[in-house]
Design a protein with these regions (language model features):
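Juxtamembrane intracellular "pre-TM" segments in multi-pass secondary transporters
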Residues: 1-13, 190-220, 408-412
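Short amphipathic helix-loop junctions that connect adjacent transmembrane helices
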Residues: 35-50, 233-248
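Residue-level signature of mid-helix packing/kink "hotspots" within the transmembrane helices
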Residues: 60-68, 152-153, 257-265, 350-351
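Helix-to-loop junctions at the C-terminal end of transmembrane segments
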Residues: 66-78, 263-276, 361
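Structural signature of the two symmetry-related core transmembrane helices
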Residues: 81-95, 279-293
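Cytoplasmic helix-loop-helix junction between adjacent transmembrane helices
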Residues: 110-149
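A membrane-interface helix-boundary motif in multi-pass transporters
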Residues: 163-176, 359-381
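Multi-pass alpha-helical transporter architecture, strongest
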Residues: 181-189, 376-412
Length: 412
């Protein structure tokens, strides 16, 4: 196990290439299945949106919650063994989902899916931050998002194509994708260390939890993740309700993926000289919120897709900036622990978003208040944008200080 900064350039690039392949296959496999869980079990099986939202919330909370610990462990043993194990468990989870015939079995699949994701998510984020330099980090995150968008597009189209015949077949696609990642990562991913110090797992976690600025940033991000997770629960249901056709879910994800593929790399590159990371993050979250609110006013699939286009632009702006800032605010001597603690933002915000999103959607639908869920989702996002804008000077000073330190590490 070697320091990432000490790797020869060829090995560093190979590691980044493996991470891009991982992103493509993991997003493709995940989004071939997960968006259709709500459609399949709510519309085809007859479960309530709240019950399915609880399954997705458990998956979200357990995954990001366990990421805190695995991120800290990655500081000690390196990210590769954790990522490999996580991909293997995630593949098993989709096999369980394919055979699921009861609510308990679906919940078991969600728990396994969460544990698998918990083992690879923070270690993968730490590996990405360690293998990139501050100068090229945002560009890599933008490229990574574009690759992920391509995987999402292909995955959702394949899932929509197969969902009418057999949900189990769709789940098997997810299992194959993550099984392939396990093999690729085991063979080609270099073994690296992501921390420059000798912090123990628990001491690294204590540093992260006690860092008020880092924690404050991630608390504010919870509002963004609350909105973001509606892609897994409320948006597929809205597409089906508005159009009356399950295949419309693929159109929603197709628009989102198309924006990500075509603009996910180019738009941040065009704006990076005019806008810093924080203005781009705030603008992206605000635009996503506006797109969410507008969904409550539409009554046709074409208008829904336009709203998806707007909020997808917001996500294209916000996601690379959010990842860059999170990595920049993390201390290099406990990188995995910091990014693991940062994952709690998605665990809490996303978990609440999945469960309450399903509940609020049910309430809005039963009382003929279709605009209500989207007004709530968008308002929460706008509050997050306002909070981030207010504390921006403090975050920027810290980001600049740690970026200089990270530059020094890569140069030595």
């Amino acid at each position: 196990v070697r320091q990432a900064s000490a790797l020869p350039e060829r090995e560093r690039r190979r590691g980044l290439a493996v991470l891009l392949v991982t992103t493509f296959l993991s997003w493709g496999g995940f989004f071939a299945v997960v968006p259709l869980i709500s459609v399949h079990f709510v519309d085809d099986i007859g479960w309530s949106a709240a019950s399915v939202g609880l399954v997705l919330a458990v998956r979200q909370f357990l995954q990001q919650g366990s990421s805190s610990l695995t991120g800290a462990i990655a500081d000690r043993i390196g990210p590769k063994p954790l990522m490999c194990f996580g991909m293997f468990v995630r593949a098993i989870s989709f096999l369980v989902l394919a055979a699921a015939g009861s609510y308990a079995t679906v919940m078991l699949a969600a728990v396994l899916m969460a544990l698998g994701g918990g083992f690879f998510e923070s270690p993968q984020a730490a590996a990405t931050a360690a293998l990139t330099t501050p100068a090229d980090r945002r560009r890599f995150y933008a490229l990574n998002g574009t690759i992920g968008g391509l995987g999402t597009s292909l995955g959702t189209q394949l899932g929509a194509l197969l969902i009418d015949s057999n949900f189990a077949t769709v789940s098997m696609i997810g299992a194959v994708a993550f099984g392939t990642i396990f093999i690729v990562m085991l063979v080609f991913m270099p073994s690296i260390s992501v921390s420059i110090g000798n912090q123990g797992a628990w001491s690294g976690l204590r540093l992260a939890v006690n860092d008020r600025l880092f924690v404050g940033f991630n608390v504010l991000l919870m509002g963004f993740w609350f909105m973001y997770t509606q892609f897994s629960i409320s948006l597929p249901l809205a597409a089906k309700d508005i159009s009356g056709d399950t295949s419309s879910v693929a159109w929603v994800y197709g628009v989102n993926s198309g924006v990500t593929i075509l603009l996910g790399y180019l738009l941040p590159r065009m704006l990076e000289r005019r806008m810093g990371n924080f203005p781009m993050l705030v603008a992206g979250i605000a635009l996503t919120a506006v797109g969410m609110m507008a969904i409550g006013l539409v009554d046709s699939l074409s208008m829904l897709l336009f709203c998806v286009f707007v909020l997808s632009l917001g996500m294209v702006l916000s996601r690379p900036s959010q990842q860059t800032i999170s990595a920049g605010l993390a201390r290099p001597d406990a990188l995995g622990a910091f990014l693991g603690v940062g994952a709690l933002s998605l665990a809490i915000g996303g978990g609440i978003g999945n469960f309450t999103g399903g509940v609020i959607y049910d309430v809005g639908k039963s009382h003929d208040l279709h605009w209500l869920p989207w007004l709530i989702f968008g308002t929460i996002g706008l509050l997050a944008a306002v909070g981030l804008s207010f504390f921006r000077p403090r975050f920027e000073r810290r980001h600049e200080e740690l970026s200089r330190l990270s530059d020094e590490v890569h140069q030595t």
